[in-house]
C-alpha cells in the first residue's frame, strides 16, 4: 500500500522487495504435508516421525535474480547434490530419513537477503538457527530431522526469533562432539 505522510508530504512505499519462502516436507507415514511459509513449522514434533524429503520455493521471486539452493544429508547415503527451484531434496518411498540440511541463496538475492533455517531432530529438539550454507541437523549419528523452519531476512535486519537466539557457531551435531 502506498500512503502519504501528512507531516512532511513524503510518500511512503511498502517493501516492494518482499520475498518470502514456501516449503513442504514429506513425512514418514504421512506423505507430503501442505506447503507452509516464512518460519512456520513443516514436519512434526513429538511424534517420532522422520522427514524424508523437502522442497522449497521463493514467494514473489521477481524482485531480484537468484534463488535458493539446498541439500540434504540422507541416512545410508550422505550428502545429496544441491537442488533448487522447488525440486525434491531427499528421497520418497525409500523410508530414509533426512539427518541434516543446508541452504544457500544465489544471485542478487544473496546480496540482499540471508536465509535462516533450523531443524528439530530426534533426541535433541530444536537446533539453533543457522544461515547461509551452515549445517543444521546431525551427521554421523543417525538422528532424524523431524521438522524444520525457514525464513528469508533482509541483510541488516534480524528476525525476532533469530535476535533472541543470536546464532550459535556451527550447531550441527557430529559423532562424539558438538561444534
Locate each region found by the language model.
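Lectin-type carbohydrate-recognition ectodomains
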Residues: 1-179
